Amino acid sequence: DLPYIDFSKPWWSPSTTNDLTYGDDKALIAVGDLALSSLAATYCYFYDKTDAETYKIEDLYDVVWDGKWTIDYVMQVTKDIYEDLNGNGERDEEDYYGMTQQMQSALNTYLWACGGRVVQKNAQGIPELVYKTEKTNNIIEKLYQLCYESEGVCTARKFDQSMVTSSADDVIHYIGAISFKENMTLMTAGTLDMTINYFRDKSTEYGILPYPKYDEAQEDYYTMVDGYHAALAIPKSVQDLDFVGIITEALNAESYKIVFPAYYEVALKTKYAYDDESVQMLDMIVDSRIFDFGYVYDAWKGMTFYFQT
């Protein structure tokens, strides 16, 4: 037990105690507001509002609120959206599509968005593998339809590495962000920090949506946070637990009061959200974040990554 740490406080993610603990609520790592990247790395959908009007698409915010924002809906609304931008008469990587789907971590996110999990805690609080289920198989089949059988979805682009804002990341992870920035797609999936890193100079207004549900019977929208976000842990070698505990709690509390609002309320909600509806969507998305024990501890090579190609 670490003195002064209180996971009931609002500067700690509820998922820390709900999903990242084991046994009698033991936690090896925790996610708090000091780890600002846990907000930046949250997955969502983006859609081009100007193009949505051009293609006479209904108000997608209403679709979300009505519980009809599903993978089937995404396939239906994008299936006939296409434009031959390079004029070669062929559907290829240089054309405009209804949806551009990155086939890496943004694809993995559908597992949680559709109500699936890698592990869940049993009655004793011990994480158990729940990945190999009929539910997971159904999600995979649905994603196959989205990525390989829907003509309105593009899964490959020929972008240069120089178009990535961080030279350390491979361009394959950002085909959705670049396509959206360059007005080559109606919608895409990505992380919230793309609003700052890629879309600040986008020529048209866009909206922010949660990941779609598996079907309308699913009650809630869910999302996950990409693995590049920070988390907090205390080394076993620490001797002055009182000092570490009170400083850790204080830093998270002050970030909650000062830093988090500057990023979330000012940057994301004010500078990079174009309407009040996107602000409401942001609150929904952030409140629905899941930190799956099986994803956090799989070291980028576990079952979590079976979805991506």
PLM region spans:
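Short, solvent-exposed loop/beta-turn-alpha elements that line the ligand-binding surface or hinge
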Residues: L2-P10, V64-D66, R117-N138, E216-Y222
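Aromatic-glycine-rich donor-binding/catalytic loop that engages nucleotide-sugar donors
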Residues: T50-V64
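Glycine-centered hinge/linker elements that transmit conformational signals in sensory
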Residues: I71, M75-D80, Y110-W112, R117-D169
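Beta->alpha turn/N-cap motifs
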Residues: M103-Q104, A189-T195
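Paired acidic/hydrophobic, glycine-rich loop segments that form the ligand-binding mouth/hinge
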Residues: T185-T191, G207
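Extracytoplasmic/periplasmic substrate-recognition and gating elements
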Residues: Y198-V266
